[in-house]
Each structure stands twice: as C-alpha cells, then as structure tokens.
Amino acid sequence: LVMDARATGRTPLYLDEIIRRVPANLNELGYMGTIHRDSVDEQQLSGNGWMLRGLCEYYLWKRDEKLLPVISRMADNLFVGGEKYYESYPISPESRKKGVGAASGSLSQIIGHWRLSTDIGCVFIGMEGMLHALQVTKDEKLRPVADKLVNLFLNVDLTGIKAQTHASLTAMRGLIRYADITGKPEYVNEVEKRWEI
C-alpha cells in the first residue's frame, strides 16, 4: 500500500489508520505471531520482513518518528533474537521435503531449530526487511545478523532447494540494498549471477 501510495500520489483511505494500529497488534516482543523460544519459524520471518518493509517505506515517506522504535524492536527481538539459528538453516536439497512449495506458505517440516515453510527460501524475504530496517535505523546490532543472513543466502543453491521465485527476487533486492549500505558493489555482482539462474 505504501509503495502504491508513493507511486500514485494517492494515499489509500485507511493506510494511516492501519499504520497507527500496527503496534497494538504485535506480540509482547514487538513482532507478529507466536513467540518461539527455542526455534525459528521461516514463515514468521517472512511475514515480519514484509511488515518491516512497509513500515520502513512509510517512515521514509512520512518521517513518522513514532515508527522508528517499532521498526527497531521488531528487527531486534525477532531477527537479532534468532541469530544463533541462522547458520543451521537447512540449505541442503536432500534435507528438504520433495513436492512442496507454494506462494502462500505453511509449515512444511521441522528440522533442528527450524520450522520450515512450504514457501521455500522465504527466510530471505525476512532478510530483506531486516536489511531495510538496518538502512533506516542505522542500528549496528543488526550488522552481524545482516552479514550472517546475506552469507547464508550466498551459499544457497536456489535451484537445488527449489526456492520460490518471489523469495529469491526479494532477497536479490536485499543484496542491492546491502551493497548500498556497505559500499560493496560485489553484492550487485552476486545479484547479477543469480539473475541468470
């Protein structure tokens, strides 16, 4: 909605009210969904990644300072909070269930501390939202998490795990954003390589 509003110059009727209501509809740690103490839900990272993107875009458009702590808390408690599990994300095609995958994700299987989605690779949708939060908040606590998730993405065989197209393309947008954040154009080169897949 925010991107549409910015592109058309017409604010959707209920957009400001939706944004105003977001904080009251988050859990006690400041993000959407169930609090998983000993696991990470891939679909939850994705949904909150989309939410972060929307909140960041709204902030950049309206400069609504009340959103910065909402963005920071969501990124910190969900993404920094799950940092210890990122290296164990199952990237091996052999570890994945065969014959699953849908644009609308649901729980596919549990491997270790990961609650995996049928929307394969949607963890990287979350990564893109978290990278946008890093760009907007400049919160250096997010930097090591960003490095871990970006490196994870760079090591995934997207065709091997049958990653969803929208998850892969969203992650590539995140890499372009990270190239801007870090000043490292090699991330753009990585996007170009994956674009050819």
Features from the language model and the residues they span:
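Glycan-recognition and catalytic cores of secretory/periplasmic carbohydrate-active enzymes
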Residues: L1-I197
